Amino acid sequence: LKEKEPGGFTGPTEFAKRIPGRQLYEDCYICGEIDFIFGSATAYFKNCELYALNRNEKINSYYTAPSTYSNQKYGYVFDHCRLTGNCPDRTVMLSRPWRIYAKAVFLNCEMSGQITETGFSDWNKEESHDTCYYAEYNCHGEGYVPQKRPPYVHQLTEAEAEEYTMEKVLNAPVYPAEP
């Protein structure tokens, strides 16, 4: 990991190269339109603001589209992040699986009312219901509606959430990309 640099950034373009590895984003402002956090890295986001931009669509944005490989223990973990934007209410989704083994966990996050009640999309990949791992723990805000989440989204216990500390996630093995 490189030293932390202050500031924020705009999500990469759609076809920018992504490299598997471990990444830490702390106290960042991350802004984009659609799938603006994408790739196969194991990444930990701590105290970040994720800002979704309005595209004037029925679904304006997806914050994440993990392309996690099947042999990775972790994908994206968001800890104490704020999920905001300038989109109308209920027009943004937290995540959709780029690959069917997508992993994204949201811990202690503030979720604005622009997030849909279901929160997550299977992107018409029903097989991902058995293979992806989406989870939430101790989130709050108008966009956190756990009783409306799909059955494949886990609501973690405190003990389960302890498996997603920064130390555990960033020290997990990173395997080469699958062929």
Enumerate the language-model features and the residues they cover.
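Sequence-level preference for short, compositionally simple segments enriched
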Residues: 1-179
